[in-house]
Amino acid sequence: MKILVLNGSPKGERSDTLHITRAFLAGMEEAGPNDVTTVHVNERNIAFCTGCFVCKKNGGVCVLEDDMREILEQILASEIVIFSFPLYSYGMPGALKNVIDRMMPLSSWNMVRDEKGKYGHRMQVDVSRLRHIMMICGCGFPNSKHNFEGAVRQFELKFPGSTIVTVPESPMFNIPQAAPFVAPRLAALKKAGAEFAAAGALCPETLADICSPMIPEEIYAQFANGERT
């Protein structure tokens, strides 16, 4: 399986969320070897979309000559694309948002209406190789409610049918002292990856397990605030 991980964390390799993503990928590896490419978006030259829409009229060629051209090729050559990022202002970091916006060349100017009444642009490139799109997002708050909703809804609209994993308390993945609480979650994420590799989806019970807080939110908040009681 050819997998592309777009790491949107400004921390790059030090990303908290990347620990989550790699545990999931380790589980997928149990079902068979995968060809995984990780792109650290913060290290690439990706300008913001200028909204000229030339790409929708010339067959999908962006006028901006930067690293996004290579990333678009990597997306189209992949079977699974994972957007891995920390929650920033209830959305995604700006560099990764540039990537999403710069996917504009994949679709044409022509609009189509789906069975739910939603309009979108018709694809103008072959995306048949791409089987799954996934969002893996961590956040520094101790609960999911009132935090992930904006990012989740944006992803649902942009990539209907995608798999979405949201994990609160994600800074714990980079804290050695939190290992007793983190280890069971990493094991659960690995198990979830194996499930996804086998079924192409995650059951609600699995999602509930991997997306729940690792420790009670009140205790997490105390530690995050520097309190020791």
Ranges and model annotations:
Residues S9-K11, C139-P142, S170-F173:
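A short, flexible beta-alpha/helix-coil linker loop
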Residues R14, V61, K145, T166-V167:
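A generic secondary-structure micro-motif detector
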Residues G94, S144-G150, I175-Q177:
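A short secondary-structure junction signal
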Residues S162-S170:
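Beta-strand-loop-alpha "switch" segments that mediate conformational coupling across diverse proteins
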